[in-house]
């Protein structure tokens, strides 16, 4: 594959303005005059180089060399029209930026059209940028399990097939029908290990923003193997189920016996409320037991603004989630803790103790994420595990869905609650969902 050099439009303009000779040695006329006849194309170069090229990336600036180029009225790359600027057209040179939109039909040709509707074709390939590998349908998929990788600029050609490399394993040949511009379907190859997935196209190779089978930042795995396993560290005892990932335990928020209103105006405690409040009813509080620690002692939240909260979720088709949002709330021990109010901890903090007022107290206006998956088209997962991700920078809503006025700090990540309530208008519909959750973790966004 040829070596490419990307330049910005502004740089290209600067090249023309300073009269660099790599594209044209003739001064630009004071005024553009269109000509009759048809153009002739001899070759194409980069605007700042004498290197001849037969292909370029989207949004790159190229210089067409030929004759009678003032006759060009329109220029198309495949089926995408480029923008012409007559200030950068002479009889022998035409400077143009390759369109940034993927073609619907790829012909690998440039079409130069005149005002008399005559068209001249020239063979030239437009390449998308290197692929962007943003997320995967299920980060903990087992070998042989089918997953979907999402991103952009996925494509393959007969002479340059798309390749997917899992850590320690190659996914092999990918069928054309399993590839779209923004997704690719693939089976996890045998022997795949934890790490970043790489995807290669004719445009280059990129590593995933996520880590496959990520073992970093684990807060709760609900079986105590690598993370906390409790489902009861507050006032309410959510259930644990044996149907977790890999046959382990997972959290079960069981609304099958409830009737959730669409807007969440009636909150649901008991089996539909997960609380983890740090502390062990000690005085002073030491957070000394495995399941009493502050979450920010387990994971470093110093750079929380560039982190994401992730977990796997499974929603049965016969108990869909069609309304009533979930509040995802981190909090400091000075707002709520597992113990008595007024007790100090070994760090000098005065603890708030157990309470159910901090999360809807307007004077605190604690930021949180309000999750409405049905609004994005997900009311169930067909009983399969999928990975969901919430940028902590998006934790910005108050209890009722309005913008929160409070601020999060690294100390705000001691506790976690998942709570079906409020935060919505009348969108959605009443429901009795069952929501399984596993592997709650906080990791860098990239």
Regions found by a protein language model. Name each.
Residues 311, 325-327, 331, 385-434:
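Extracellular beta-strand ligand-recognition surfaces/modules
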Residues 344-406:
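Extracellular carbohydrate recognition and processing domains
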Residues 318-344:
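Beta-strand acidic-aromatic groove motif in beta-rich domains, primarily in extracellular
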Residues 18-22:
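C-terminal motif of bacterial Sec signal peptides marking the signal peptidase cleavage site
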Residues 222-224, 295-326, 390, 440:
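Extra-cytoplasmic beta-strand recognition segments
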Residues 24-70, 117-159, 194, 203-221:
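Beta-strand/beta-sandwich contexts
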Residues 208-255:
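Extracellular carbohydrate-recognition regions
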Residues 257-306, 335, 348-376:
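Secreted extracellular polysaccharide-interacting domains
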């Amino acid at each position: 594959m040829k070596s490419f050099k990307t330049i910005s439009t502004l740089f290209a303009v600067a090249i023309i303005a300073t009269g660099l000779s790599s594209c044209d040695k003739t001064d630009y006329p004071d005024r553009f005059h269109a000509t009759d006849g048809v153009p002739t194309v001899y070759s194409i170069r980069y605007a700042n180089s004498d290197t001849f090229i037969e292909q370029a990336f989207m949004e790159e600036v190229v210089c067409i060399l030929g004759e009678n180029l003032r006759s060009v009225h329109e220029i198309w790359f495949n089926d995408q029209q480029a923008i012409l600027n007559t200030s950068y057209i002479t009889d022998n040179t035409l400077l143009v930026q390759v369109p940034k939109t993927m073609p619907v039909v790829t012909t690998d040709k440039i079409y130069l059209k005149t005002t008399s509707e005559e068209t001249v074709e020239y063979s030239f390939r437009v390449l998308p940028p290197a692929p962007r590998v943003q997320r995967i349908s299920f980060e903990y998929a087992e070998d042989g399990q089918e997953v979907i990788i999402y991103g952009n600029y996925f494509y393959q050609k007969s002479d340059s097939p798309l390749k997917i490399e899992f850590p320690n394993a190659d996914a092999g040949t990918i069928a054309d029908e399993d590839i779209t511009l923004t997704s690719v379907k693939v089976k996890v190859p045998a022997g795949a290990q934890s790490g970043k997935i790489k995807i290669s196209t004719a445009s280059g190779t990129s590593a995933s923003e996520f880590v496959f089978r990520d073992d970093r930042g684990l807060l709760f795995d609900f079986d105590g193997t690598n993370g906390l396993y409790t489902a009861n560290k507050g006032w309410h005892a959510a259930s644990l189920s044996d149907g977790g990932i890999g046959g382990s335990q997972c959290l079960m928020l069981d609304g099958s016996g409830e009737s959730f209103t669409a807007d969440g105006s009636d909150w649901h405690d008991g089996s539909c409320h997960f609380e983890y409040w740090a502390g062990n009813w000690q005085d002073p509080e030491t957070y000394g037991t495995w399941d009493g620690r502050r979450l920010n002692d387990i994971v470093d939240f110093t750079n929380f603004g560039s982190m994401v909260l992730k977990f796997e979720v499974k929603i049965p088709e016969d108990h869909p989630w069609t309304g009533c949002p979930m509040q995802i709330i981190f909090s400091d021990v000075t707002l709520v803790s597992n113990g008595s109010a007024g007790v100090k901890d070994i760090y000098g903090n005065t603890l708030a103790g157990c309470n159910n007022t901090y999360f809807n107290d307007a004077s605190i206006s604690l930021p949180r994420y309000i999750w409405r998956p049905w609004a994005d088209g997900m009311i169930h997962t067909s009983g399969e595990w999928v990975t969901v991700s919430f940028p902590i920078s998006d934790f910005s809503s108050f209890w009722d869905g309005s913008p929160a006025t409070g601020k999060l700090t690294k100390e705000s990540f001691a506790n976690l609650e998942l709570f079906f309530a409020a935060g919505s208008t009348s969108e959605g519909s009443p429901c009795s969902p069952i929501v399984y959750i596993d592997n709650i973790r906080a990791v860098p966004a990239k």
